[in-house]
Amino acid sequence: RRDRFSTIRQPDGLNGFMLRTESEHDCYGAGHAGTALSAALGMAVARDLAGGHEHVVAVAGDAAFTNGISFEALNNIAVQTQRMIVVLNDNEWSIDRNVGAVARYFHRIVTNEHYQHMHQRATRLIERFGGKTAVKVVRRAEEAAKSMLWPSILFEEFGLEYFGPIDGHNLPLLVETFKFLKTLDHPVLLHILTQKGRGFQPALDGQKKFHGLGPYDPETGKTPDGSPTWAELFATSLADLADKDPRIVAITAAMPNGTGLDHFRPRHPNRYFDVGIAEEHAVVFAAGMATRGFRPVCAIYSTFLQRAFDPVVHDVCLQKLPVLFCMDRAGLSGDDGPTHHGLFDIAYLRGIPGITLMAPKDEDELADMLKTALDLPGPSAIRYPRGSAAGVVCKPQPQALPIGKAEVLSDGSDVAILGLGPMISLAKDLAATLERDGYSAAVINPRFIKPIDRETLEHYASRVAAFVTFEDHVKMGGFGSAVAEALEEMGLAVPVVRIGWPDQFIEHGKVDQLRARYGITVEAALAQVLPLLTRRQRRALVAS
């Protein structure tokens, strides 16, 4: 893949994450942190059962150890297999700075002066002599230091022998260390120290920004200026509401920059909580705060909320707690691909009793929905996409919306077009196209996915030949399905043309190109709705 590296995260180019179908060297697909140890243990046990002798190495960043699944795997490694190597790649970063007791523990190891002195000597020894003898000397020195400094290193309590920390950029040292570790007959953990962005000064200076970004100036590291994003506007609106309501608290799972909460944090530092890459904990933590009268807002990517589905059901919704989930990156995420698209949240949330689901068409409506949700007595969720917002000027003060009531933007009698959230732009474009052909089209901003506005649906069902729904979500279980279900339950036999993503994982690429490829377009909707309108006209002519 070396000669194709310039195509990474580009349409039809290399994926930004490991993908088994892309290369034999990608032994496991990954995009969400914390899975390395469990997957590697599964491979090691499979090797043992098959009588194999290959070495299995799990490489996990220090941030991944803030995720509970890593410790669940640690609890099983020494019990399930005799041979496995875990590499802890410690650079003190995930997307943002690592937080919590685990990060402090790693930092304490790294900054201990005895370890620093020992590893300086170890490095010189490896460089001078090399080979297994030098590694064994280093190992004995480490054992002496560990017994002196900590009676029981955390990982050794789990049954893994601990080595390190060593310089992760010293290739000769790494090679000799791995040669030695391969001779051992028990699970081991190697702690290596690396620098995020090493070798490129702008990346070292902007480690948060350079975690994942688009085009930039290679000389300065600067990126083009952009319009305010949905995430930034969400956080600013939330901070404004928090100015007046001391019950509002904001929670993120290691994504303060991505969710925009780094705009909330300076204004309300005591009501901002970063729990690390721990989505399940974030949700249950929010539930606990809600039981004591606070109004937790859990800002999380749609794709990452999947990791906390059970707590959403069991700890929040079952207890009818007023936790608000603000789901960033809802819809197609673009270049990050299938591990990061937010195409399933409507399907996995709308079946939960008692939750209110909303999708704003623009940033002004997002502020209104935040106000609305924070006034509710129970759980709620707001979904909004990645990237720049619509550029609408917000009202001075947000207003609570009537629950379950859609906004009719224009009336019509032939077809009713519902565009969920920012997909309202496609609904307007379809209406304009149909009206040029002589049809009367109603354009509706649903606002609420649940409860759905049955009154408005019933009103138009008696007038139109068809409904059309646009959504940035899979069709199966999505908003269009909710419309069809509501009509069926009311005994209203009106066709519903659903424009959404198919029942498959969508690859990475530019949003507009992928929409064109998969028929999330006005043209695709037109091809499906015109026959229904033409049929209605023919029936009307026959009747007359």
Predicted features by range, described:
Residues R1, H186, T194-Q306, P311-L321, ...:
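Non-catalytic terminal/interface segments that mediate subunit docking, oligomerization
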Residues R1-Q80, W230, R247-I248, T252-A253, ...:
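Cofactor-binding active-site loop characterized by glycine-rich and histidine/acidic residues
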Residues R2-P11, V79-W93, H114, C317-R329, ...:
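A glycine-rich helix N-cap at a beta->alpha junction
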Residues Y28-G29, G52-N67, M84-V87, I248-I251, ...:
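A short, small-residue-rich loop immediately preceding and capping a beta-strand
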Residues N91-F234:
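Long, well-ordered, tryptophan-enriched scaffold segments
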Residues A134-P202, P322-M327, I346-K395, T521-S544:
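Structural signature of the thiamine diphosphate
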Residues E176-K179, H211-G212, T229-K244, G260-P266, ...:
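Glycine-/acidic-rich phosphate or pyrophosphate-binding loops and their flanking alpha/beta elements
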Residues P215-P218, K222-S227, G334-D336, T356, ...:
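Peripheral docking tails and interdomain loops at the edges
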